[in-house]
From Swiss-Prot:
Effect of residue 306 to A: Reduced binding to phosphatidylinositol 3-monophosphate (PI3P)
Annotated segments matching region Catalytic region: 49-325
Top-level taxon: Bacteria
Protein's recorded name: Cysteine protease RavZ
Function: Cysteine protease effector that inhibits host cell autophagy by targeting lipid-conjugated ATG8 family proteins on pre-autophagosomal structures. Specifically hydrolyzes the amide bond between the C-terminal glycine residue and an adjacent aromatic residue in ATG8 proteins conjugated to phosphatidylethanolamine (PE), producing an ATG8 protein that cannot be reconjugated by host ATG7 and ATG3. Mechanistically, Ravz interacts with ATG8 proteins conjugated to PE via its LIR motifs, extracts them from the membrane of autophagosomes and integrates the PE part into its own lipid-binding site.
Species classification: Bacteria, Pseudomonadati, Pseudomonadota, Gammaproteobacteria, Legionellales
Effect of mutating residue 212 to D: Reduced ability to cleave lipid-conjugated ATG8 family proteins
Organism, scientific name: Legionella pneumophila subsp. pneumophila (strain Philadelphia 1 / ATCC 33152 / DSM 7513)
Encoding gene (name): ravZ
Location of the motif LIR 1: 9-23
Motif LIR 3 location, chain numbering: 429-443
Active site: 176, 197, 258
One Pfam family in the UniProt entry: RavZ_cat
Outcome of substituting residue 343 to A: Strongly reduced binding to phosphatidylinositol 3-monophosphate (PI3P)
Protease as UniProt keyword: yes
Chain ranges passing through the membrane: none
Length: 502
């Protein structure tokens, strides 16, 4: 999708053009869908706002404020690499609008994490002749509220606020997700701002690119400093040095994962503040994709965005009560529905059918599983025939990206397989309806059995044949012949084991 980017667009692409890249390349980045209004906005209805599964999303496809807020649910998930429960507890009161409050378990540090908001935007002018830029009214208001809170605070505090910075002339760059933190020391009455940025600054490539493109500014540091100074103007606070802690990640022009790096850094800042240690992030200029945002981090992020169906009210309870949000069966159903909807819109890739399953096969299997899960959710019994059909579709359901979706939910629902998830709800038939029909002539066609034949079959000598056993065999034949005679009168007797005689 091509179009002009504005401060209201929700795209968070994480790169300024490298040396040699043309400004028009910005159009290659797709705009993401608009955000829902988040808590703290009067328009929000917490009871109905939902962040649904996005089963086709990947970590490099970009972040928006809705996705970032959804990821906050991982902070008190004990199975997540982003778990904060060992470092902080939640504050019962909510002294700051739009922020979650935490108390360090190891010192008196208080930490306030603001919810992501699409209106937290700052713009910078790239040329030296213009003023520094602008800060969105809502972001400016949050800075004033932080200043007001600190005027009454007696404990050290750290404020964490994700925001988007962008050039006022969008042809000179792109929107970029960064993280603003402000540390407050009540003894010295000093506020110290820091911006964490996933684009390496002060590198040779960055400086050379800015020089040739005539960029006097490439960040919002100057306008943010001015805004913070304005917020504390009527106080006796001092402002510490504004610092931008920048680090690199790989393939910045093609990876839209600055939002994922921001989320990773939120966790790092909270844990470090709670422990009273320095925030440890990679240095500027280093390629750090796999060492900082590890494969486990990426998996947790993608699984949350792709497979979970979470409401704003759920995330609020997790962050205000410090509890894990268990995966529900209903989330499994919604994720499958999203997968089915997207898969039905895709064209058939026949070249892959030799090694995988066709589009039709996947959709059929998904529809079957959705129906079964809905029955389980409604506490209805699953028929034996439904179960048999599911067993036949298991391999298809566990294939490729669909298999990852299914495996995620099975693991979180505590089931080793689809069969074990469904089996407790299956009602098996108590009676056998399908009889085996045998012709009566075949039933009574009993060959003569001689001692010699039995002996030869057994591989024993004729003299060792048990005469009593031979007599029993003959008696059986006699009894069967008697039954045959009775049948001539028209009497038909069913035999044991569900076998009946014609």
């Amino acid at each position: 999708m091509k179009g002009k980017l504005t401060g209201k667009d929700k795209l968070i692409v994480d790169e300024f053009e490298e040396l040699g890249e043309q400004e028009s390349d910005i159009d290659e980045f797709d705009l993401l869908e608009g955000d829902e209004k988040l808590p703290g906005d009067s328009e929000l209805d917490k009871t109905t706002s939902i962040y649904p599964p996005e089963t086709s999303w990947e970590v490099n496809k970009g972040m928006n404020s809705s996705r970032l807020h959804k990821l906050y649910s991982l902070f008190f998930d004990k199975s997540s690499a982003f778990y904060l429960g060992d470092d902080v507890s939640v504050l019962e009161d909510k002294p700051l609008t739009g922020a979650y409050g935490f108390q360090s378990k190891k010192n008196d540090q208080q930490i306030f994490l603001f919810r992501p908001d699409s209106d937290y935007v700052a713009g910078y002018h790239v040329d030296a002749k213009s003023d520094a830029g602008w800060v969105n009214d809502k972001l400016d208001r949050r800075l004033s509220e932080i200043s007001e809170f600190c005027s009454k605070a007696t404990q050290p505090a750290t404020f964490i606020l994700p925001f988007v910075e962008m050039p006022t002339d969008i042809t000179k760059g792109v929107q970029h997700q960064v993280l603003l933190t402000i540390s407050y020391d009540p003894k010295s009455k000093q506020l110290t701002p820091t911006v964490y940025d996933s684009i390496g600054r002060d590198t040779y490539s960055e400086s050379l690119s800015s020089y040739f493109k005539g960029k006097y500014r490439t960040t919002c540091d100057e306008i943010l400093t001015q805004s913070i100074e304005k917020a504390i103007k009527s106080t006796d606070f001092t402002l510490g040095k504004f610092t931008r802690a920048a680090y690199n990640h790989q393939n910045r022009l093609t990876e839209g994962n600055c939002g994922s790096y921001t989320f990773r850094t939120i966790k790092e800042v909270i844990s470090s503040s709670a422990q009273g240690t320095e925030v440890k992030i990679p240095g500027s200029g280093y390629i750090t994709s796999n060492s900082y945002l590890t494969s486990q981090h990426v998996q947790d992020i993608e699984s949350c965005i792709k497979y979970r169906n979470l409401g704003v009210v759920d995330i609020e309870s997790a962050l205000t009560e410090g509890k894990t949000l268990p995966v529900q069966l209903s989330e499994f159903i919604v994720a499958l529905e999203d997968y089915g909807k997207l898969r039905s819109q895709q064209s058939e890739k026949s070249m892959l059918n030799f090694i995988g399953y066709s589009k039709t096969a996947k959709l059929t299997a998904v529809e079957l599983l959705i129906g079964i899960l809905n029955d389980i959710k409604g506490k209805n019994e699953i028929s034996e025939s439904q179960y048999d059909k599911l067993v036949k579709e298991v391999d298809c359901l566990m294939d490729s990206s669909l298999g990852k979706l299914v495996q995620f939910h099975l693991k979180n629902l505590g089931a080793e397989s689809l069969q074990k998830l469904v089996l407790p709800c299956v009602k098996f038939d108590d009676t056998i309806d399908d009889f085996v029909t045998i012709e009566k002539d075949e039933l009574f066609d009993v060959p003569d059995i001689t001692g010699e034949e039995l002996a030869s079959k057994k591989g024993i000598e004729q003299g060792a044949l048990d005469k009593e056993a031979l007599l029993k065999q003959k008696q059986i034949k006699t009894d069967l012949l008697d039954l045959r005679e009775e049948d001539k009168t028209g009497l038909k007797k069913p035999l044991h084991g569900g076998i009946k005689v014609k």
